[in-house]
Design a protein with these regions (language model features):
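A helix-boundary/hinge signal
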Residues: 1-213
């Protein structure tokens, strides 16, 4: 042991094993991921991929009347896997930690889309334009809960339309964030609403959906 850290680790290990009393029984290997302690390939597979799948039901997202790139972005967003400042900092990448939309709070996926005063203003405009089909989100909700709660208990056609509006709204909030980050340009919430309407209009003309009420 050549360093103070190694000595500290040795002392910690000693404390852990010093109080262990052996009972004379033969040691045996126990697999803690099954009830009987026996290893199975099925349990190993489930453990390996347990965190690889989204915990929400993505069917509402993939069936939305939106383009594939918008749906894929939203799939990452709902799992909070987009590269916001909090994620960049966790990777030790240099960045401005503050939200560039409001400039008053740290940036995260949930903040940009739900909590930011700028985003809340955009949602208010979208709510008015959609005749309350889409409502301003609860700032205390998680993205996953917001997405799931927003699309429950409604007819399939209406749900696919509403999901599209949600997707195009968060997509344009993210684009506004990127304009400010990489181009130094800022747009008012009304302009973001106009961009949302334009993208939905392009999709409607190309595919016949979604039809906003």
């Amino acid at each position: 042991m050549s360093t103070v850290e190694e000595m500290a680790q040795f002392v910690l290990l000693w404390d852990l094993v010093h109080g262990v009393v052996l009972n004379g029984e033969e040691d045996r290997i126990i697999w803690k991921f099954t009830a009987d302690g026996l290893y199975t390939t099925k349990s190993a597979y489930e453990i390996q991929f347990r965190c690889s799948y989204c915990s929400f039901k993505p069917g509402y997202l993939w069936s939305a009347y939106a383009e594939p790139k918008h749906r894929f972005f939203s799939w990452l967003l709902v799992q909070e896997k987009i590269l916001t400042a909090d994620k960049l900092q966790a990777r030790n990448w240099p960045c401005n930690p503050m939200c560039l939309l409001c400039k008053i709070a740290p940036e995260s996926a949930s903040h940009i889309c739900l909590q930011c005063p700028y985003a809340q203003h955009v949602w208010e405009l979208v709510q008015s334009w959609s005749h309350d089909l889409v409502r301003k989100p609860d700032a205390n909700s998680t993205i996953e809960d917001w997405w799931t709660d927003s699309l429950q208990s409604m007819p399939k056609e209406q749900r696919r339309t509403k999901a599209a509006i949600l997707i195009y709204t968060v997509w344009n909030l993210w684009n506004e964030r990127n304009r400010r980050t990489f181009q130094g340009k800022e747009a008012e919430p009304l302009m973001v609403l106009q961009l949302i309407k334009e993208e939905i209009g392009l999709r409607l003309r190309a595919c016949g959906k979604p039809c906003v009420p």
